[in-house]
From Swiss-Prot:
The record marks H180, R241 as: Transition state stabilizer. One of its GO terms (cellular component) is cytoplasm. It comes from the Bacteria. PANTHER family: ACETATE KINASE, ACETATE KINASE-RELATED. This is Acetate kinase. GO terms for molecular function: acetate kinase activity; ATP binding; magnesium ion binding.
Length: 401
């Protein structure tokens, strides 16, 4: 079965074509600057060079059309005919309380997605536009929506309810949702596979650490808590996001700096985190360089704040689950940052592991980085959200037949 996975951003479209018979990526690419001038498609068939195509893309529909043309093109494509695509899996950021799992898309599902726009005004409109365009261009091809929030819908109410007047939850569905669910789900399943243990008997803490970062407590294969909340602004310090701050800071800054609420939230989303503290960059590589090679004090402080918050969250989730069997690192920093992993794990060895410093040098590959005699296993597992989306799509489409 060949599955096209799509991730539509406000002005971009990331895609992968996967052959689920062997799990291989056949082609992948990125359409950028959709609806802006100088639109660009970067397309790559597995084993061949990247190809850049400059072509006007006024909207997502035109971008999808160009992607499909590239996939069936005699010279740069991989398919003979569009009919070879058996299904399309769409990444959708927010499924609200409607969706606890991936779902086959029909008109009813689209209505519910539109009802969630308030919860993800930056992401859901583009996700929906991509779905609608695909349904027009590829009528009759089954489509599946896979949600960033769905995996965390197993959180108990005491983990997701905010201690504010309950009527706001009833009226506006203000609660903790959590994000990066597809990544947390993939790496927790993969950890159980690698350890050859049933996931039902494991307590796993998954650390998705990148420009956006979140941690999940996965007990028996179900998410029981996660660090992001109503929006992806809650939780850890991130690349440019503040994570948890005292809400009174917002009104304090409005008053002192003459800013609107929107402007302060913008600062917390785009100018804070390790970028805000260091004043250098939101790229952890730049900050590590400045901290370790140039002795930059604020860069070092940014790294310490980031690591400290991750460490605290690992500790609190160990308490929430009554123990931990596995700690997993994934995403950009988690997969490729040996120094940061060591920083985070320092003083956590009382949980029942010893870090193998040699194995911890690994970057971007699956590896158990704790010593063999460690009771608690610490692992690096590169995330693969596209594969997880394709897997869910395959499962639902096979159920149709």
């Amino acid at each position: 079965m060949k599955i096209l996975v799509m991730n539509c951003g406000s002005s971009s479209l990331k895609y992968q074509l996967l052959d689920m018979d062997n799990g291989k990526v056949l082609a992948k690419g990125l359409a950028e600057r959709i609806g802006i001038n100088d639109s660009l498609l970067t397309h790559q068939v597995e084993g061949k060079d990247k190809i850049k195509i400059q072509k006007d893309m006024k909207n997502h529909k035109e971008a999808i059309q160009i992607v499909l043309e590239a996939l069936v093109d005699k010279e740069i494509g991989i398919l003979k005919d569009m009919k070879e695509i058996d299904a399309v899996g769409h990444r959708v950021v927010h499924g609200g309380e409607f969706f606890t799992d991936s779902v086959l898309i029909d008109d009813e599902v689209i209505k519910k997605l539109e009802a969630c726009i308030d919860l993800a005004p930056l992401h859901n409109p583009a996700n929906i536009e991509g779905i609608k365009a695909c349904r027009q261009i590829m009528p009759g091809v089954p489509m599946v929506a896979v949600f960033d929030t769905a995996f965390h819908q197993t959180m108990p109410d005491y983990a997701y309810i905010y201690p504010i007047p309950y009527e706001y939850y009833e009226k506006y569905r203000i609660r903790r949702y959590g994000f990066h669910g597809t990544s947390h789900k993939y790496v927790s399943l993969r950890a159980a596979e690698i350890l050859k243990r049933p996931i039902e008997e494991l307590k796993i803490i998954t650390c998705h650490l990148g420009n956006g970062s979140s941690i999940a407590a996965v007990k028996g294969g179900k998410s029981i808590d996660t660090s992001m909340g109503f929006t992806p602004l809650e939780g850890l310090a991130m690349g440019t996001r503040s994570g948890n701050v005292d809400p009174s800071i917002i009104t304090f800054l409005m008053e002192k700096e003459g800013l609107t609420a929107e402007q302060v939230i913008d600062i917390l989303n785009k100018k804070s985190g390790v970028y805000g503290i260091s004043g250098i960059s939101n790229d952890f590589r730049d900050i590590e360089n400045a901290a370790f090679k140039e002795g930059h004090k604020r860069a070092m402080l940014a790294l310490k704040v980031f690591a400290y918050r991750v460490k605290k969250t690992i500790g609190s989730y160990t308490a929430a689950m009554g123990g931990v069997d596995v700690i997993v690192f994934t995403a950009g920093v988690g997969e490729n940052g040996p120094e940061m992993r060591e920083f985070i794990l320092e003083d956590l060895e009382f949980l029942g592991f010893k870090l193998d410093k040699e194995k911890n040098k690994v970057r971007g590959k699956e590896e158990i980085i704790s010593t063999e005699d460690s009771k608690v296993k610490v692992m690096v597992i590169p995330t693969n959200e596209e594969y997880m989306i394709a897997k869910d799509t395959e499962k639902l489409v096979k159920g149709l037949k």
